[in-house]
Amino acid sequence: TSPIAEGLFDKAIIQSTNTRNFAELGEASYDLPAAEMEGVNLFKTLELKTLDAARAADPQELTNRSTMAGYAPAGTIDGTYVPRQLNEAFDDGEFAKVPVLAGFNSGEARTYRMLLPRKPKTPEAYEDAIRARYGNEAEAFLALYPADNMEESMLAVNRDNVFGGSTERIVRSAAQAGKPAYLYVFDHCYPAMEARDLCAFHASEVPFVFGTVGNPESYPPRWPQPPRRFPFPPWRYRDRAG
């Protein structure tokens, strides 16, 4: 959606994207503080007086201290590189009109449990909360995310809200612009994933896409190790075939 990137791509593969609203540079919007004010507050917390002091700091220490201070880096609507909120840009057709393959993983939220609200004590309390929040749409919500398995339903809501809705919007926008558009859901689960209740977690498709499945040294220390031999998904070769 950035005008500066116009003409840079002739096709796109988008994995587990998120088009949520971002902070705008100089003013508060969508219940988010201005990005500049976030920076000012972070500098105060870290006791940094100038940009030069921040640039001179040890990068890892700066990252660690920022994280401990509750700072979460994200995009900024700066009016130049990212001129508008992403959802607004897609809805108004202000994006690269290229063929697109976009998707998300069925277990995206399993590594984002900290984003879930506290689980209600009973299924009845869950249903009451949904009816109070969603009104006339509550029954449709409960049909998709029932109370009989609250944890799985809450994980699914987070997945669909953050990743599924964003992906669908992108694919529909590309299709409406007359471009080939495909949506996938990656739901593969191997034994090491299942043992840790992480089936199809966020980014678990990446080793398959880039062909590093058979190289255990390429994974972070806590990554569930996949079996050595697997066929690669077809989108690995899509950039060659179009």
Per-range role (PLM):
Residues 22-30, 86-87, 147-161, 192-196, ...:
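Active-site rim elements
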Residues 6, 11, 15-129, 152-176, ...:
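Substrate-access "cap/lid" subdomains that shape
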Residues 14-20, 146-150, 186, 214-215:
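Short acidic (Asp/Glu) and glycine-rich catalytic loops that position anionic groups and cofactors
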Residues 1-5:
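Short glycine-enriched nucleophile-adjacent loop
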Residues 95-142, 190, 204-210, 224-235, ...:
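C-terminal, loop-rich substrate-recognition/catalytic regions characterized by aromatic stacking residues
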Residues 165-242:
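Mobile gating loops/cap/lid regions near enzyme active sites that modulate substrate access
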Residues 55, 74-77, 141-146, 185-187:
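Short coil/turn segments at secondary-structure boundaries
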